[in-house]
């Protein structure tokens, strides 16, 4: 493989081979990006948006959790820095993060997601946004964040990446097509090993879908999505599909074939008609239970993302669970913003835990707030507050992420930020029991201890 340092020729929608290898730049601490989009959301956006997943993966062979985020440079420039960090579960130490890409944008929509293959190579998928291109990177060594190969430079907004047991890579992404009224369309493509991609062979899954969440369980892909009609803010309805051939064909939850591309709002994959209920939904997470059945976490709202403040109430965190025959819908708690995002996990004992900024913070009715850990012991029917992780904070916390295949020492991580004006953004993580730690903003050593937060 030829290795050199230099510019990369853009390869839009072409089959790509390894093109460049470089030594990524060692960072000097954990600092999140601050970002705003007028009228909808603002604040600490290091782990935004929810439609890029996964952002963190626990690797049992290395006993480390690797996680990506959008960072800010030490000199305070607002250029988004694509960063990767690691947590050593044996030593309880954080690695000094690595700068993989200094992006020519401050748009947090370009934040990355990641995956780890069966050989331990770390793949990073840097999202595209408008004229800003996406990229795919692979670590030069297994379970190592010091150097990466650049594989692809292409257009892939909202990437979601999963690696099957046979080594094939599935990538879901979005395209914008203003020519036929379907502004946002969902596509997927597959690579044999993640190093070569042919985006011309992508499968078009849905028109007007856009916002989706995916997960892979024992060879079966699940996808949940809403209807985001022609770019309007009225995202509604809840749909679920599954695939046993890594996205070539799809079926409904009960196994009936789905014609592609799906056209909304009428499709057999609809599991709840929120359009008739005049409600809006904001997808947060999709996981599977011990039987492989899907569970969805989402916000149910009375108004779209521009309907912030009390006029958007009531807003509820909701779960939708499939038991193999039918769907069950249950509320967890109320929230005060459509983008009060979080994640859901189920442990080996069947305990459900949802974590996110569900309490109002110092800036109510804006993105995020105070982080709370919620628990259910009856498959999501009833919930209790297990622990309030943050309180009396200076800034709102937002966009809590939980690693795929998590280990209890590193359960959730996120950033904070002032939602009313540009500010610094610190990064935090917690363990399964809700013990809270802050990641140091300044680091001069390869590995450091996290800072306990009382």
How would you label these PLM feature ranges?
Residues 25-454:
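Extracellular, repeat-based ectodomains that mediate carbohydrate processing or recognition
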């Amino acid at each position: 493989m030829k290795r050199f340092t230099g510019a990369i020729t853009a390869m839009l929608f072409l089959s790509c081979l390894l093109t460049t290898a470089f030594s990524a730049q060692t960072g000097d601490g954990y600092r999140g990006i601050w970002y705003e989009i007028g009228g909808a959301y603002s604040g600490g956006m290091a782990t935004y948006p929810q439609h890029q997943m996964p952002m963190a993966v626990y690797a049992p062979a290395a006993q480390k959790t690797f996680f990506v985020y959008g960072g800010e440079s030490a000199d305070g420039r607002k250029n988004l820095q694509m960063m990767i960090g690691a947590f050593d579960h044996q030593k309880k130490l954080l690695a000094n993060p690595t700068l993989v890409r200094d992006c020519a944008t401050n748009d947090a929509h370009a934040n990355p997601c990641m995956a780890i293959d069966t050989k331990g190579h770390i793949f990073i998928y840097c999202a595209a946004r408008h004229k800003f291109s996406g990229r795919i990177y692979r670590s030069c060594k297994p379970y190592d964040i010091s150097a990466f190969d650049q594989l692809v430079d292409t257009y892939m907004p909202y990437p979601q990446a999963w690696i099957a047991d046979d080594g094939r890579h599935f990538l879901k992404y979005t395209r914008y097509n203003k020519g036929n009224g379907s502004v946002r369309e969902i596509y997927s493509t597959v690579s044999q090993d993640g190093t070569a991609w042919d985006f011309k062979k992508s499968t078009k899954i849905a028109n007007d879908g856009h916002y989706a969440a995916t997960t892979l369980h024992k060879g079966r892909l699940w996808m949940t999505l809403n209807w985001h009609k022609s770019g309007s803010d009225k995202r509604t309805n809840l749909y679920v599909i599954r695939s046993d051939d890594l996205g070539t064909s799809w079926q409904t939850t009960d196994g009936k074939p789905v014609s592609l591309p799906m056209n909304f709002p009428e499709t057999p994959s609809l599991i709840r008609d929120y359009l008739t209920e005049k409600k809006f939904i904001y997808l947060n997470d999709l996981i599977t239970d011990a039987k492989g059945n899907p569970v969805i976490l989402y916000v149910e709202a009375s108004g779209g993302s521009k309907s912030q403040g009390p006029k958007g109430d009531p807003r509820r965190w909701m779960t939708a669970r499939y038991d193999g025959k039918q769907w069950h819908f249950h509320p967890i708690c109320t929230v005060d913003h459509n983008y009060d995002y979080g994640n859901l996990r189920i442990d080996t004992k069947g305990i459900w835990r949802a974590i996110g900024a569900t309490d109002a913070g110092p800036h109510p009715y804006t993105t995020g707030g105070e982080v709370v850990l919620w628990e259910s012991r009856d498959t999501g029917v009833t919930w209790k507050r297990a622990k309030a992780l943050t309180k009396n904070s200076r800034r709102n916390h937002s966009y809590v992420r939980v690693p795929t295949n998590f280990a209890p020492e590193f359960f959730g991580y996120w950033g904070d930020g002032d939602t009313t004006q540009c500010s610094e953004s610190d990064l935090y993580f917690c363990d399964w029991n809700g013990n809270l730690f802050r990641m140091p903003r300044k680091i001069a050593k390869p590995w450091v201890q996290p800072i306990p937060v009382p």
